[in-house]
Swiss-Prot record:
Residue ranges annotated as motif ER-retrieval signal: 285-288
UniProt KW Cell division keyword: no
Organism annotation: Mus musculus (Mouse)
Name of the protein this chain belongs to: Protein CLN8
Cell location: Endoplasmic reticulum membrane; Endoplasmic reticulum-Golgi intermediate compartment membrane; Endoplasmic reticulum
Quaternary structure and interacting proteins, as annotated: Interacts with CLN5. Interacts with CLN3.
GO biological process, one term: neurofilament cytoskeleton organization
One Gene Ontology term, aspect cellular component: endoplasmic reticulum
Keywords for this protein: Endoplasmic reticulum, Membrane, Neurodegeneration, Neuronal ceroid lipofuscinosis, Transmembrane, Transmembrane helix
Bilayer disposition of the protein: Multi-pass membrane protein
Domain TLC stretches: 62-262
InterPro entries referenced in this protein's UniProt entry, alphabetically: TLC-dom, TLCD
Length: 288
């Protein structure tokens, strides 16, 4: 395919009538279906090819597939977010009201992804009889925030796209957790990935400071273009990210580098280890 035809294909994908609610809702549904497909394909491939995956408990398998799905979304979000932050002249010129067709595409598909995340979290909680309030609130804020951007035709795209850039850590988080479950926490690759992941969380903190700066510099335009509930939700969510979520996860990931532990399932593993010791068996290192 020639560069000209490639450029034309990209334009045809993004050059849609985004003023139409039908187009936006269709893309949101497409985002949901696509990432559901990623989840299912990951399960099928891991079941066939990965010994570590087959040895996991059902709850851990769900987490494994969700981590892989989030990593794929993280690649999409990081690519789009970096271009919005560093490369797009329209968004750079007007950070409050600037809009681009390619941004509409990512905002609507991200809405579908975050809806998938909420469905997956609630079904997992129901099936395994668990409830993580922190995780539920986090995903609910993300979905409502992007739903507000997908609905509001006047909303600028810069802040929405830089919010997507916060997903830059998810591919590294996925790799870290999978290798940890495989027993590779002593490997140089795991440690290097962990260092990069910690760096990404520091970059997330810097990015939230930049987003506050954009909010303060364009306060009037943002207040007039966003619906009050959406604007309040965004500010509250950004405050949580800045003051609680980013510092907390940066601390946890740094702690994990020094003491490699899967705290997501620490209690289950501790219980399993006690049972194995009771039966006179020594836990074996898992392999990929």
């Amino acid at each position: 395919m020639t560069p000209v035809s490639s450029h034309g294909l990209a334009e045809s994908i993004f050059d849609l009538d985004y003023a139409s609610w039908k187009i936006r809702s269709t893309l949101a549904v497409a985002g949901f279906v696509f990432y559901l497909g990623v989840f299912v394909v990951c399960h099928q491939l891991s079941s066939s090819l990965n010994a570590t995956y087959r040895s996991l408990a059902a709850k851990e398998k769900v987490f494994w597939n969700l981590a892989a799905t989030r990593a794929v979304f993280g690649v999409q979000s990081t690519t789009a977010g970096l271009w919005a932050l560093l490369g797009d002249p329209v968004l750079y010129a007007d950070k409050a009201l600037g809009q681009q067709n390619w941004c509409w595409f990512h905002i609507t598909t991200a809405t579908g992804f975050f809806f998938f995340e909420n469905v997956a979290v609630h079904l997992s909680n129901l099936f395994f009889r668990t409830f993580d309030l922190f995780l539920v609130v986090h995903h609910l804020f993300a979905f409502l925030g992007f739903l507000g951007s997908a609905i509001n035709l006047r909303a600028g795209h810069y802040l929405a796209m830089t919010t997507l850039l916060l997903e830059m850590s998810t591919p590294f988080t996925c790799i870290s957790w999978m290798l940890l479950k495989a027993g590779w926490s002593d490997s140089l690759f795991w440690k290097a990935n962990q260092w990069l992941m910690i760096h990404m969380f520091h970059c997330r903190m810097i990015l939230t400071y930049h987003m506050w700066w954009v909010c303060f510099c364009h306060w009037d335009a943002l207040t007039s273009s966003l619906h009050l509930p959406h604007w309040a939700l965004f500010l509250f969510g950004l405050a949580l990210l800045t003051a609680v979520i980013n510092p907390y996860w940066t601390h946890k990931k740094t702690q994990q580098l020094l003491h490699p532990v899967d705290w997501n399932f620490a209690q289950e593993e501790a219980k399993g280890s006690r049972q194995e010791r009771t039966n006179g068996q020594v836990p074996r290192k898992k392999r990929l």
